[in-house]
Amino acid sequence: MDRLIRSLLMNQNKQATDKLDHPDTSETVNISSLALLKMLRHARSGIPLEVMGLMLGDFVDDYTINVTDVFAMPQSGTSVTVESVDPVYQTKHMDLLKLVGRTENVVGWYHSHPGFGCWLSSVDVNTQQSFEALHPRAVAVVVDPIQSVKGKVMLDAFRSVNPLNLQIRPLAPTAEPRQTTSNLGHLTKPSLISVVHGLGTKYYSLNVAYRMGSNEQKMLMCLNKKSWYDQLNMSTYSELEKKQEEKFKSINKLIAVFNKDIDEVKEKPIADKKGKTQEEVKKFGKINAKQQLQMITSSLLNDSLCHQLTAMINAKSMT
């Protein structure tokens, strides 16, 4: 610490210049669908507390890290931070994975920030530095299960910056602690809270990509796959009556809108081709009453017929 303070004091009088020897940051973290689902499920189960786990995968080359699987750690957390990693549990779990033919290595760790974004606290930076002591390319992934929605996952990957290599004064205003020298992927736009907590000085962000293989596609297709006996599950008559009543109310409203559209067409004279185009443009963004009526009536008939047929099949099979 004293050496760092002395070096900073000695560099105060130097002129600010750009440093062009920054390392490349085009490194990409590829997260599989299975690992992403397990991380989100684990993070949601711990709300409002933080949870953590380890990521398994391999370092493909100098610019690619593959995360194939994750497993949870039995760490108790608070709403701000989590405890350190349990080495005994980690060793036992890795030994059990090797017995079943899983030879992946630990490429980093993940933890959740429920509701307050993706960034690293001082405790998280210390935990990440302990992982980097074992492997210099270890990655810390932060996921926010509350702000994540369908089709958009709030997730980011980080790695710490060595404070001995960071010289603050000699850097010009245009210089950065880390420089991106590749157009592969994209970095997420940093939030204000992440910048306040040291993004760019204590740690930096990495590109994150999500990949899906053929086996993972089959797995995801089987998650909500229906079987033949699911069609025999019959809803109660009260539920069917309630749904039909709601559909009849919507049909009455659509009939009024449809009659209004018909009256407007009758009142207007026959327009030329240009006038028809303008009328079609005016209808954009409005409810197509005719199409909605066809959809609701067809679904109403299908539900009624399926309910009657299901009741007949169930009654016949029980006799």
UniProtKB/Swiss-Prot annotation:
UniProt KW keywords: Hydrolase, Metal-binding, Metalloprotease, Protease, Zinc
GO biological process, one term: proteasome-mediated ubiquitin-dependent protein catabolic process
Domain of life: Eukaryota
GO molecular function: metal ion binding; metal-dependent deubiquitinase activity; proteasome binding
Annotated InterPro entries: JAMM/MPN+_dom, JAMM_MPN+_peptidase_M67A, MPN
Keyword Transmembrane helix: no
Motif (JAMM motif): 111-124
Protein known as: Uncharacterized protein F37A4.5
Biological classification of the source: Eukaryota, Metazoa, Ecdysozoa, Nematoda, Chromadorea
